[in-house]
Amino acid sequence: MAPSKWDDEEESTSPPPVAYRRKFDDEEEEDVLDSWDAAEDSEVEREKAAKAAEAKAKAEAEAAAKKKSKAQRIQEHKEERKKREEEDSSSESEEDEAERRARLRRTEKDSDLKHAEDLFGDIDLNRTRNRGAPKAVVVSDSADPTQAVDLSAMPLFKPTTKDQFTRLTTTLAPLLTAHSKKPQYALWAQEFTKQLVKELNSGDVKKIASALTTMSNEKMREERAADKGNKKSKAAKTKVSLVTSRENKIDASYDDDDGLDDDDFM
């Protein structure tokens, strides 16, 4: 019976193995998945933050550009124009004088248009520029129709500066005012003035009307002074004529009266 006792003790001291859940393995796998998700989320957040920072910097730069004064923008355009001219001159040193002047005019015109767009915003400058462009005005000789001149192509009729407008005035005014004594001149001048101010705004038209009113008042004063002078001269002439006539009448009466009556001879 002894062996059976040892067998019982051996069986009692060796309990059957218990199957444990792999808790740590499962938890480690879940932790790895969570860390991957967190890494992806952080990468997305970093991209969003970078985009937001870039957009903010761009907005701040645009706001700073808008806050620049007019003088600063003009100075920047001048510097840009000068830099572009220097680059063009270095790259096109072999061009002749006429080509260089034409290029400089184009460069200056483009810079001025860019400057205007910067100052005035979304105004349709192309539409405004085309509207202000002069149409072809061709004058032909009735005796020889083949002889024609396009006035709009002449530099005189393309003024841009104050001196050029003054030259245009001094050229045209004598040609037009030479007909001021003709009966239809005043009516033509009214219609001509309307056409001249047709494209101006109301403020500029008001200034021109005020200048014409001032000229009208000056003309009235001159005419009144001239009429007054004529009346004084006429009155003086009339007075002298009356005095002369009276003196002649008095002298005639003395000549007829010798101081003797007819009875003195009796």
UniProtKB/Swiss-Prot annotation:
GO biological process terms held by the UniProt record? formation of cytoplasmic translation initiation complex
A molecular function GO annotation: translation initiation factor activity
Question: Where is there biased composition of kind Basic and acidic residues?
Answer: 45-65, 73-86, 98-118, 218-230
For the keyword Coiled coil, the answer is yes
Subcellular location per the Swiss-Prot or TrEMBL entry: Cytoplasm
Q: What is its main location?
A: cytoplasm
Instruction: List the biased-composition ranges (Acidic residues).
Output: 26-44, 87-97
Which cellular components does GO assign to this protein? Answer: eukaryotic 43S preinitiation complex; eukaryotic 48S preinitiation complex; eukaryotic translation initiation factor 3 complex
Region Disordered: what ranges?
A: 1-142, 215-243
* HAMAP family, per database record: eIF3j
Q: What does this protein do?
A: Component of the eukaryotic translation initiation factor 3 (eIF-3) complex, which is involved in protein synthesis of a specialized repertoire of mRNAs and, together with other initiation factors, stimulates binding of mRNA and methionyl-tRNAi to the 40S ribosome. The eIF-3 complex specifically targets and initiates translation of a subset of mRNAs involved in cell proliferation.
Q: How does it assemble?
A: Component of the eukaryotic translation initiation factor 3 (eIF-3) complex.
Q: Write out the similarity annotation.
A: Belongs to the eIF-3 subunit J family.
Protein's recorded name: Eukaryotic translation initiation factor 3 subunit J
Species of provenance: Aspergillus terreus (strain NIH 2624 / FGSC A1156)
For this protein's source organism, the top of the classification is: Eukaryota, Fungi, Dikarya, Ascomycota, Pezizomycotina
Q: Which gene name belongs to this protein?
A: hcr1
